[in-house]
Amino acid sequence: MRLLIHTDGAARGNPGPAGAGAILRDASDGTVLAEIAEGLGHATNNVAEWTAVLLALESAQGLGATHVDLRLDSELVARQISGVYRVRHPDLKPIHAAAMKLLRSFDGYTVGHVPRELNKDADRLSNVAIDAPTSMSPSRSPLG
């Protein structure tokens, strides 16, 4: 199964209250299979962006995906995944390593940068995660 995954991370204050959001769709028909909105406490925007990717990949693996098409509005993270830029910050290295290990476990993957206006669903989820009361976050809701 091939999934189209949109992810976004947000931090208010950078660093500040942060959240990760993702929406996973069946690439063949666009059916939403899962949404992720997870509060991250106090973090930077880049930590939130990378955490959103990692959480989405974990969910994709759990759904049995064989291929993933990642779409992010963070050009930096898209280029780090593609290997154009290196990950240098110590806070990002373990998240990056875990995400790349997961990516390599799929039969194939693509990554692309999309304009913010094409990533509204993931952006909404990352902001929901920041705004949600602690008892509501993290929330990962597979849809059926």
What do these predicted ranges mean?
Residues 2-3, 29-34, 61-64, 105, ...:
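Intrinsically disordered, low-complexity regions
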Residues 1-47, 51, 55-66:
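RNase H-like nuclease fold core
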Residues 31-34, 51, 96-100, 123, ...:
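Short, surface-exposed, polar/charged, turn-prone segments marking secondary-structure boundaries
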Residues 10-14, 53-129, 133:
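RNase H catalytic domain
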